[in-house]
């Protein structure tokens, strides 16, 4: 677990690094960032202390992916959405329930010890009647995951027990069909709602985005895109970002992608979010769950 530092230190770190580099940096959904070790890839896991109060500036030790210019999700509409927590109430990544005892998240969200919260709408630690709490007992990143290249950015997490299916907690199917340009999708998460400032929402945020052609994706990020990724966004500057990493991209009722990485600051014109392309991994997901159940 990374050591918590004052929030101003991380803001100052990000600003100084940006000035020194003189270029726009890429944001990952959750690697720890340190001023002692500047990197061209800025992590975007949230590590927000939920006890600090929803909507306040981050009390975190790294950056995190978030929903920029989204809106409050309707309650009970994202029952597969999970929060990965460090300590009692520190959000660091999103995840998706894909099986009664298994989650998918981004491989760069891997931690040794963490808790999982499902069925919760607010970012606050206050108990909600639909919530279910779990321990993550096994994390299995894809064997082809590479950092900082971000290829194959997915990981399976086994829960310590099966979920109790309710209106607030249920799995979603992973799509076996790859998305086409123009497909309308929805991304959700509790990540920061401003960039480069850090400001966390009170409740789960949702955003409608459109899948872009692979050419537009490659043009936006030359020599950084492969077929394990796809880009999505819109012209109005709406995007996922820090704190949303590992969260779901749902298209036509199925799980199509996971929040992976993107530009920093987020929600910049012609710099879309980049998502793990799950249609390429359905066999690995099924076989891994079967082999470890």
From Swiss-Prot:
Keywords of this entry: Disulfide bond, Glycoprotein, Hydrolase, Protease, Secreted, Serine protease, Signal
Tissues and organs where the protein is expressed, per its UniProt entry: Expressed in skin, breast, brain and testis. Expressed at the stratum granulosum of palmar skin.
Domain named Peptidase S1: residues: 67-290
UniProt GO cellular component terms: cytosol; epidermal lamellar body; extracellular region; extracellular space; secretory granule
Glycosylation sites: 69, 173, 208, 252
Regulation: Inhibited by Zn2+.
Example GO biological process: cornification
Tree of life domain: Eukaryota
Residue stretches of biased makeup (Polar residues): 37-49
Location in the cell: Secreted
Residues marked Major binding site for inhibitory zinc (site): 150
A molecular function GO annotation: serine-type endopeptidase activity
Location (main, coarse): secreted
EC number assigned by the record: 3.4.21.-
Pfam family, one: Trypsin
Signal peptide: 1-22
Segments for region (Disordered): 37-68
Cysteines paired by S-S bonds: 73-206, 93-109, 178-279, 185-251, 217-231, 241-266
SUPFAM superfamilies, A to Z: Trypsin-like serine proteases (SSF50494)
Alphabetized InterPro entries for the sequence: Peptidase_S1_PA, Peptidase_S1_PA_chymotrypsin, Peptidase_S1A, Trypsin_dom, TRYPSIN_HIS, TRYPSIN_SER
Active-site residues, record numbering mapped to chain: 108, 153, 245
Family according to the record: Belongs to the peptidase S1 family. Kallikrein subfamily.
Function: May be involved in desquamation.
Assembly: Interacts with SPINK9.
Matches recorded under PANTHER family: KALLIKREIN-5 (PTHR24271:SF59), KALLIKREIN-RELATED (PTHR24271)
Protein name as catalogued: Kallikrein-5
Species of origin: Homo sapiens (Human)
């Amino acid at each position: 677990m990374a050591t918590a530092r004052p929030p101003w230190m991380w803001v100052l770190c990000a600003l100084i690094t940006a000035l020194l580099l003189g270029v726009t940096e890429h944001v990952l959904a959750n690697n720890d960032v340190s001023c002692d070790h500047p990197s061209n890839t800025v992590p975007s896991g949230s590590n927000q202390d939920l006890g600090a109060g929803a909507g306040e500036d981050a009390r975190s030790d790294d950056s995190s992916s978030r929903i920029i210019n989204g809106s409050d999700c309707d309650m009970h509409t994202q029952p597969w959405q999970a929060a990965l927590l460090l300590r009692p109430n520190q959000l660091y990544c999103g995840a998706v329930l894909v099986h009664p005892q298994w989650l998918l998240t981004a491989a760069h969200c891997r931690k040794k010890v963490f808790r999982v919260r499902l069925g919760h709408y607010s970012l606050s630690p206050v108990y909600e009647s639909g919530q279910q709490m779990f321990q993550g007992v096994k994390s299995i990143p894809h064997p082809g995951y590479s950092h900082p290249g971000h290829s194959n950015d997915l990981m399976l997490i086994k829960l310590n027990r099966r979920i109790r299916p309710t209106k607030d907690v249920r799995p979603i199917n992973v799509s076996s069909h790859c998305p086409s340009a123009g497909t309308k999708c929805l991304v959700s998460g509790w990540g920061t709602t401003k960039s480069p400032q850090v400001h966390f929402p009170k409740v789960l945020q949702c955003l409608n985005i459109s899948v872009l052609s692979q050419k537009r994706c490659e043009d936006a990020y030359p020599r950084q895109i492969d077929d394990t990724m796809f880009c999505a966004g819109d012209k109005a500057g709406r995007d996922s970002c820090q704190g949303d990493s590992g969260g779901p991209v749902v298209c036509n009722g199925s799980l199509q992608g996971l929040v992976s990485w993107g530009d920093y600051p987020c929600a910049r014109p012609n710099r879309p979010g980049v998502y793990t392309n799950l249609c390429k991994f359905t066999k690995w997901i099924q076989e891994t769950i079967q082999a470890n159940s």
